[in-house]
Amino acid sequence: MAGKYTPRSNSRTILFLFLIAFSLILFLFLFLFSVSPLRNSAPSHSLPHFQLRNVETSFVTSLEHFLANANSHSPTPPDQQNDIGKLDDAVYHSEMDRLFSDPYYPLSLPLRVYVYDMPPKFTYDLLWLFKNTYADTSNLTSNGSPVHRLITQHSIDYWLWADLIAPQSDRLLSSVVRVHRQHQADLFYVPFFTTISFFLMDKQPCKALYREALKWITDQPAWKRSGGRDHILPVHHPWSFKSVRRYVKNAIWLLPDMDSTGNWYKPGQVFLEKDLILPYVPNVDLCDARCLSETNPKRDTLLFFRGRLKRNAGGKIRSKLVVELREADGVIIEEGTAGEGGKEAAQIGMRKSRFCLSPAGDTPSSARLFDAIVSGCIPVIISDELELPFEGILDYRKIALFVSSDDAVKPGWLLKYLKDMRPAHIKEMQQNLAKYSRHFLYSSPAQPLGPEDLVWKMMAGKVVNIKLHTRRSQRVVQGSRNGCTCECKVSNITNTASVIS
């Protein structure tokens, strides 16, 4: 009878409702499992690419935020270690404590870095000078490049300093920690903006400021104790600090390359065992995961180059390459500078190309290499004297082709070399570029495995040698052979045959 209640019908209803509820729970579980990061917990090295979120990579935008919050940056508390002897004793006790308490000392991370609290005329005043004059696009270098964009691509001093002095709660790097007592430090960071002062100050006031900075730095007890060997000095543009840097040649220089021709650095001033190569700040935007998936199948230009076609010193190879390649099918060679229009043209060209030409300029390096990497365009490096950033960590053979200058200018050789490249090899290198891009993007906050992080991982390998030379200099007696004769300076000549496979 309709509507009549029976125990059997009630049990069927309960069973039906149970099955529906169970199905909903099972569906929800499977959905959550499918989106869980644990489901595809592949090792990070197998990930095809990465994406930046809530990170600022623009120097201008990051600087505006930095200066707007300048009062929140914690200054270095005064460390009253004005007596070199007392500082040396304090360092000894600190190092002995670490030796017996840390089984990995002195190779362990994080590195302990003391950041000097220099007078504002060496730091904040120069940053404000850049910000207040940035809109003046008429300020050009002798070759027509906008000065402020040139400063931007050498702004490694800003990115490192901004991260070091940020509140610890805002920092993401575990490779370095800031200490506020000099005797606790492995290294000392000198936050003087040498490139901004060189390009934005008149010649004589700039030289005067360099002399003041030199005196301030070399008067520090920690500098006198080590002769500057454990001090980090950012001189990323080859002209910066040039008039006085012979007096600080023992310090660790942060450089764009190591020109061995003598045009930029004097013999004995720079070498790999002492100094560190840092990448330029890219001039173009990152081609992220979505961009790469859209552009890689459509890269129909074989080889692309946009830049100055005539350069001095090692860059003379450019004019020879123009003669060889300019009319070739599938090749785009354009004259251009790094202005806003130039940035857009270079970015579009690189994202349409499989290979990007990266020849030497006035110096062995240029920002173009890093523009190509973040654009997903395989660099073709023709710069026989080039030294590369973080090469103790990164294997550039996986993302770039190295061609000797002699081979590159042989009629037809370079085009045949590129056209004979197997599609599978090209695809593999493009995938590797997607993984490597993160290592060349300066950002705020600084990211793990970004260039700021790799700086300190590379520095960790120098600490033992720095301590060796510091202690050796402290105990060498007068009249002894006080010059080290164990420098290893192997010539750096590109051998195309060794990298074809």
Residue ranges and their predicted role:
Residues 2-340, 346, 351, 431-434, ...:
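Juxtamembrane luminal stem/stalk of type II transmembrane Golgi/ER carbohydrate-processing enzymes
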Residues 345-441:
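Catalytic binding pocket for nucleotide-activated donors in carbohydrate/polymer assembly enzymes
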